[in-house]
Structure formats: C-alpha cells, structure tokens
UniProtKB/Swiss-Prot annotation:
Pfam families: adh_short. It is an enzyme of class 1 (oxidoreductase). This is Short chain dehydrogenase pgmD. Belongs to the short-chain dehydrogenases/reductases (SDR) family. The lineage of its organism: Eukaryota, Fungi, Dikarya, Ascomycota, Pezizomycotina. CDD domains: SDR_c (cd05233). Gene3D superfamilies: NAD(P)-binding Rossmann-like Domain. Keywords: NADP, Oxidoreductase. SUPFAM superfamilies: NAD(P)-binding Rossmann-fold domains. GO terms for molecular function: oxidoreductase activity, acting on the CH-OH group of donors, NAD or NADP as acceptor. Pathway: Pigment biosynthesis; Secondary metabolite biosynthesis. Its EC number is 1.1.1.-. The gene is pgmD. NADP(+) binds at residues 46-47, 171, 207, 211, 242. Induction: Expression is significantly up-regulated at the end of late growth phase, in the presence of Butyrolactone I. Expression is positively regulated by the pgm cluster-specific transcription factor pgmR.
Amino acid sequence: MAQPELDLSKAPAHWGMNFTETTHQQPSRRIDPSNVTFPQGYTVVVIGAGKGIGEHIAKAYVQARAENIVITSRTGSDLDRVKKELETLAQQTGQAVKVSTLVQDATKPESYTKLKDLLEEGFNGRLDTLVFCAGGGPVGTLWTPHIDETDVDEWNESIALNFTGSYYAAKYLVPLMLRPQSHGKTIVNITSAASHFTGGNITPASYSIGKLALNRFTQILGENYADQGLVVVAVHPGSSPTPGALGSMPPSLHNILTDDQGLCGAVCVWISKEKRDWISGRYICATWDMDDLESKKEEIVKEDKLKWRMAV
C-alpha cells in the first residue's frame, strides 16, 4: 500500500504540535546548551546514544559542561566514535569530561544491572540525569495496517525497544537517583508524536502503542516519586533525518524530517538545568518555544494539561 505524505501543519489540535505560539526547528539562543554550566561532578546517562538523537543529546550535555557522561548502544563501534567526538568537543571548550561507554541491549534487564554497577564503581553511584533514548521505527511487516499480517517477533521487539526498556531503566537506576549525592533527579524519556496516531498506514501500531505506553509510564513515575523530588518528562524530539528515521520510514514520509538533530538535546539540557517539577509527568515537544511553554506554567498545572486522558 502506498504511504500518504504527512503534513504536520494540519495536525489535529489534540496532537499539541502548536501548543506554543512559536515553534522552532533548531535550538534557539535561549536554550543554547553552551550557555549552561552544570555543577561539579554532574553525571548523565544517555541510553541509546550510538547515533541520531541520542548522540546529539550526549553532545548537548558536554556543551553544558556536564563532567561525567555515560553512553550506551548495541554497537560498540558507534560508541567508540561518539566517545571520541564528545572528548574532542570538550577539549574545544577547554573542559574536562569523563566519557564511559557500555555496549548493551536496551530490551534486556541484565543490561541495566551492568549499567548500575558501572555507575556504582565509576561514579560513586551518582546519577543526576537519565535520558532514555533507546527506540526505533518499526521495519518489516509492522508497516501494514492489518494486524493479522504482522510478525509476532517484530511486534514484541518494537514494544520492548520503545517502552519496556524504560521500565528496566527506572527499576534499576531510580534508586541511584534518589541518593543524596545525586542532585539532578531528572529523567527524560524520548517519546514521539506518533503516540497520537492511530492510522496504521502512517505510523505502525506497535510504534504508536510503545510510545503511548512510555508517555503514561512517564506520568506514573512523575506522580509516584514526586515526594522524593524526581522529575520525569516525556519529550517528542521533533522530526529529524536521523539514520533510524531514514532507514525505517517510507520515502513518502521523509518530507516531515526537517528538524535539527540537536534540537532535542538542547531541550533536555533546558529541562535538567533547574528544577522543573511543573512539567513532571507530562509530555512536551522539543519544537515548542520553551519561553512560551514556561509562560503557560500556571495554566498547565491548574488545568493539568499535557497528559493523556479519555475525552467524554
């Protein structure tokens, strides 16, 4: 079946693409990571940082002078390349950064026990910001709108990659984030506007469902750990021409891939740089103007916006 082109400018209001009057395709000066300096010893983990959005998120935290960066990916060669680029970036700005890597399968619980051990041994158990960026667009049979034609293993892999891994990350790493030495107490889950979609010929059902579950999980974590100071935010990174997007999406949808890959990283740093409990448990878009968003703070909290609920 031919895939129709998608025009996000005509998206329904409930998708929230234009929740702020101003939107961006590149980081604005107001959220430039290089204008941020994190406290001494600040430690960040980016799960799924071998390429694309995750790689650029890690670079944003280096620009913001985070001293400790841990990056993970399934592919060791990708991690080696990103590690070198992060270290070079730090040298260019005259700062010291410790970059650690871990080859892991984000869908396996044992990967997170190894990550926890790495943090315990190498960083005294400190974890300020956790970014869960593992995920990927479906391939193969999952693009069919007919569920009976999908492959079971492909379906399960898609759900595990886009959602279940976030549960493992929270289960094993949140205890570290609640320790006194971990000051940031921030989790950013990279989701997708695809969580709004139901048309299987535009977004595969497994991907939409996985990201929708991630959004709800973000809300649950944010509410259940609010009294312990944890801030959890789901972020749609924009639509960028990443290797993953170009490799999984049909060519007819490539027209929407116009957002800068560094935009999401800048927003992640904006979330982390100060306590933003007013957006905890909520969904935001990296394309939104963060000043506009902050101006809506009272409205968002009072009306409990940017959360999923049934319209009745």
